């Protein structure tokens, strides 16, 4: 168990939980889902379908008692409007803190600090809402500028808040701080350095602008990979300066600690690189072509006419059979329209779950492919959403363990596998194999992009030629075959730009997710219990290692299990197509 802390003056506020992109998406036929339509109407609203005084019961794999409900106002997404909030509008809140401290009024100081924190959270939420609007139309420069401006307003307001409390810590009434805050929080305020903070804010603004430039490039019909590489080179320079300012030996060390709060080092991650290359990459080499051919031979069209409602129906069907608490969360998501999975060619090509702090609720964003991936992307993001629905999030001091978060999401993908016959009919076998191979792909690419970026950020004088050479070397070491233009493949992965060194979390979490599949094959009820115990652990209070210890899943960082999982997958016929 851990206590999460965030030093806002130095660390970026990473507010987006991105969903896994580029995972070998394949299409799906709609016949099976269409045939389920009437049943879904019944299972989604049993009170309406059952006779008066009766409630239609659906047998679930698990019962209640895994989560504590979180109090919130029940609002639809359309009701969550904040607009822009400037740092100037925040200044009076900090002035109130100063005034209360000068009067040495404990009650007034408490009230001023509380109101300042709530307003700061509101500014952060406004930034998230505007980012969502911008991502819906990534071609709109005005929207992008507005979102960027709001994000900067949050950074500036957070800095003003810390500066104000730092001044209180140096004043004659500094004891007010120890009565209002925990000791570790007071230490943050005391250690605030205005000069370093201003440098950090300048670098953060440069980084945000470069990320915006990449988003604009990725929204085009065809990504200009050379331009994207140029943006990336500038990002590497800026982020390296951030690490130096923070006193870190390397940007990898800085990101692992400050952004992702991992309980292992970049050097430890090399164990995952090794198992990815030795145990999981051979599975991709052996089965990718065979499975692709089977998909082609099956006659499944690449454009299946999948609608958002098809995806929602599938989500509700599966969650209704997991547990009452999972079902409640899914129905709340749908009832209050807390998702955007509609298609638009203007959308940013990604998927993520964003927490809207002022409203105590998460929101799912996804740009669909019109393929089977639309379902698995939603199942994945709902794993994040479920955790956020029950646990909430601390906007100011919470630090997420993304490894645990990704096990909660990739584990949800695994738990849906048992419903594939109902959802996809005759295509279930091949699509189940594809989902499992996607998880193998997560292990391999999660390790590959971590190794790639660790090497990139370790270069003292990085050029574009050297950047591409490093990718070629790393790419080949994971068993992938070169093709024309492959050296720019990394530019299509948005995480490399928005959340550097995030991808190892996919690898670290996909391994126990595949282990969870073995439990699912033996006992769906036991697997559901295991998953819900993982989901019931807040990713701001626990590490992935805590969840693995609690549930008996293997910690691959300490006990290599890749060879065992790979062998069991093959022996079980997970990738065999009849």
Model-derived regions: residue spans:
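A well-structured
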Residues: 33-40, 45-309
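Sec-dependent N-terminal signal peptides
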Residues: 5-21
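Sec-dependent signal peptide cleavage junction
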Residues: 18-36
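C-terminal, non-catalytic "cap/extension" segments appended to globular domains
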Residues: 61, 186, 263, 378, ...
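Catalytic Zn2+-binding segment of zinc metalloproteases
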Residues: 383-396, 415
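Post-HExxH zinc-binding segment in Zn-dependent metallohydrolases
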Residues: 277-279, 400-430, 434-437, 441, ...
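Catalytic zinc-binding patch centered on the HExxH motif and its immediate surroundings
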Residues: 304-305, 339-361
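Short pre-active-site segment immediately N-terminal to the catalytic Zn-binding motif
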Residues: 359, 363-378
């Amino acid at each position: 168990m851990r206590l999460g802390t965030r030093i806002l003056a130095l660390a970026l506020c990473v507010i987006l939980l991105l969903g896994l992109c580029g995972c070998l998406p394949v299409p799906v036929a709609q016949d099976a889902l269409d045939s389920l339509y009437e049943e879904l109407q019944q299972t989604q609203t049993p009170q309406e379908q059952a006779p008066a005084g009766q409630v239609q019961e659906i047998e679930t794999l698990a019962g209640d008692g895994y989560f504590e409900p979180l109090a919130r106002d029940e609002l639809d997404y359309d009701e969550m409007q904040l607009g822009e909030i400037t740092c100037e509008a925040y200044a009076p809140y900090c002035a109130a803190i100063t005034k209360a401290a000068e009067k040495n009024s404990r009650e007034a100081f408490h009230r001023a600090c509380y109101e300042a924190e709530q307003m700061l959270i509101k500014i952060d939420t406004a930034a998230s809402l505007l980012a969502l609007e911008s991502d819906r139309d990534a071609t709109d420069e005005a929207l992008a500028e507005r979102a960027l401006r709001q994000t900067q307003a949050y950074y500036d307001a957070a800095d003003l808040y810390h500066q104000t409390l730092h001044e209180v810590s140096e004043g004659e009434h500094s004891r007010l701080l120890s009565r209002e805050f925990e000791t570790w929080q007071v230490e943050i305020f005391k250690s605030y350095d205005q000069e370093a903070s201003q440098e950090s804010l300048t670098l953060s603004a440069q980084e945000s602008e470069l990320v915006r430039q990449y988003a604009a490039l990725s929204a085009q019909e065809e990504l200009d990979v050379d331009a994207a590489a140029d943006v990336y080179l500038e990002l590497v320079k800026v982020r390296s300066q951030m690490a130096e300012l923070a006193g870190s030996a390397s940007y990898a060390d800085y990101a692992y600690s400050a952004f992702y709060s991992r309980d292992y080092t970049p050097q430890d991650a090399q164990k995952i690189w090794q198992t990815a290359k030795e145990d999981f990459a051979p599975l991709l080499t052996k089965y990718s072509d065979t499975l692709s051919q089977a998909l082609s031979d099956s006659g499944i069209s690449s454009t299946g006419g999948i609608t958002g409602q098809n995806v929602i129906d599938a989500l509700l069907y599966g969650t209704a059979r997991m547990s009452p608490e999972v079902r409640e969360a899914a129905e709340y998501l749908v009832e209050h329209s807390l998702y955007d999975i509609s298609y638009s060619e203007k959308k940013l090509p990604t998927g993520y779950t964003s927490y809207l702090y002022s409203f105590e609720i998460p929101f799912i964003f996804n740009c669909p492919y019109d393929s089977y991936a639309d379902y698995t992307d939603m199942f994945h993001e709902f794993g994040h959403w479920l955790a956020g629905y029950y646990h909430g999030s601390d906007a100011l001091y919470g630090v997420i363990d993304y490894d645990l978060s990704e096990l909660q999401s990739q584990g949800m993908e695994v738990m849906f596998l048992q419903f594939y016959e109902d959802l996809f009919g005759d295509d279930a076998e091949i699509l189940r194999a594809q989902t499992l191979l996607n998880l193998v792909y997560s292990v391999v690419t999660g390790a590959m992009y971590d190794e790639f970026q660790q090497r990139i950020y370790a270069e003292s004088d990085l050029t574009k030629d050297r950047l591409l050479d490093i990718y070629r070397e790393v790419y080949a070491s994971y068993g992938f075959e070169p093709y024309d233009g492959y050296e720019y493949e990394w530019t299509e992965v948005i995480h490399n730009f928005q959340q550097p060194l995030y991808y190892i979390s996919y690898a670290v979490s996909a391994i126990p997710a595949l282990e969870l599949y073995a439990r699912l094959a033996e006992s769906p009820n036991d697997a559901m219990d295991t998953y819900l115990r993982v989901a019931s652990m807040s990713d701001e209070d626990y590490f992935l290692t805590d969840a693995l210890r609690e549930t008996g899943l293997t910690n691959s960082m300490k006990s290599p299990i890749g060879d065992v999982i790979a062998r069991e997958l093959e022996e079980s016929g997970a990738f065999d197509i009849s």
